[in-house]
Amino acid sequence: TAATPNGRHAGEPLNDGGISPTHGDDTKGATAIFKSAGKLCNVRAGHGSVLNQLLHPSIFKGEESDKVFGEYMRSICDCGVWETQFNVLTKEDLLQAQKHPDEYRSLVVRVAGYSAFFTVLGKGVQDDIIDRTSLMQY
């Protein structure tokens, strides 16, 4: 793809899924992302529209984390977003897997509509996953 006016360089992906935000443009948190995605008309998206989110593991700490995540998922569906994929990792974990692939051979990630072992993906795809915004709150 060609470069775009927002500073994205030629050859870089537009986004990592049908309705995922462009890297770095998701600055208002996870809730704002799915509310925006829910406003899209996906009637002509014959193969579906996926929303990818990289969640920081700290979101799942605490007594209420399961309940809060369930409410978050219900809210996503209430907004009309029907296909959401999550990676629950830190950027540091992904960078370490890139540097030491033998130690992370079993690390599976959601790419964009499919899962793959992180260490067998090409560096460009790995970098794209690492560049996703790690959301630390809903």
Model-derived segments and their meaning:
Residues T1-Y138:
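Acidic, glycine-enriched catalytic cores built around paired aspartates
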